[in-house]
Amino acid sequence: MATLTAPDAVAMDSQKLEQVKILFQKQISDGDHPGAGLAVYRYGNLVLDIHGGNMRDGQPVTDETMFVLMSSTKPLTASCLYMLKERGKISYEDLVSKHWPEFGQNGKETVTIGHILTHRGGFPQTPESFQPSDWPDWSKVVTAMEQAPTIYTPGETLAYHPINYGWVIGEIVRRVDGRSFTRFIAEELARPLNMFTTHVGPVSYTHLTLPTKRIV
């Protein structure tokens, strides 16, 4: 566990941090979040580390509790593509179908990697037949993304791709690099940054995860 640094030592206002702490505690007390944790760093120094609420089994949230990051993983996902670009393996102008031929159907023939990164791919919706119970099966993920139809012309309309974004990037990484996206992000990003409890995909930490109703 990291040692707390005095806010003044890193030019932070301790009173402002106290206000953040009070607001956090109020939101927990008011039931805005079933469980949450908040860590604030400045210049690599931990200045605030608080948690509160309960997991769905009634156990209190602690500094060891793990949370699903949801869309906070998008910057991590994009970073993986940037690594491949730096290594000369892809260009943002590449058609996705250059690296994943089966993707180029149902209106997605002209979708580029850059379109995916900027949410201009034109297929923000996940196929209705693809249910959350299918998500852990990567082969089904790949098939669903290949079959997904566009509802906008690629490159013309900004439309947030909440889920398809990560799935498409994950498969591009797998096809270009050869490693699964789970392995790539672990070996190339998480471990070098000492993020040993940050991972993609199901793992054996389920006893530490999930507040009662909503993911924070």
Which residue stretches match the model-derived regions?
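Short, conserved catalytic-motif segment at the N-terminal edge
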Residues: 8-69, 91-94
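Single conserved hydrophobic/aromatic residue that forms the stacking wall/gate
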Residues: 207-216
